[in-house]
Amino acid sequence: MNILSGRFKGQKIRTIKKARYRPTTSRVRKSIFDMLGDLDEYSVLDLFAGSGILGFEAASRGAAAITFVDNNGRNVKLIHVNSKIFQDQVDMKVVCKDWCHYLQMQHEYDIIFADPPYGKIDIAKLVEKCLTTLLNNGRFVLETSSRESIPVGGCSKKFGDSMITIWTKTV
């Protein structure tokens, strides 16, 4: 898997063979980042990070700080390995923790990406917690199965079996 754009365009991101995560496809990633636009100096949270590709793509496109959260130790180790590509040019933190416990720590972000396992997470609870964690005008990007019920208020786009929904926090 490669970074699509930005200062690290083309950089290969290693993945785990027979991984339990489902990496966001390049087509979906391109669409997400086209919708988000400029990320200069943003703080980003990549929940259910898997390979970390969404966070790495954000770093390549100018984000200043990325926090990766995943509860799988193998994924966390892989993200640490892949983060060496950035050689301290971006502030990166990798956390091995359950998403719900992490969000209780009261950090705030400009952008939150979440790509939870399809059909295994209470999506309404996830959306509620992520929206409270965003800074004003922050955006929450959620990838789900297109068959899942999504809370209202976001802008959705379908990609085969996947759906991307983006919410913007306004006061």
Residue ranges and their predicted role:
Residues 1-171:
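Class I S-adenosyl-L-methionine-dependent methyltransferase catalytic core
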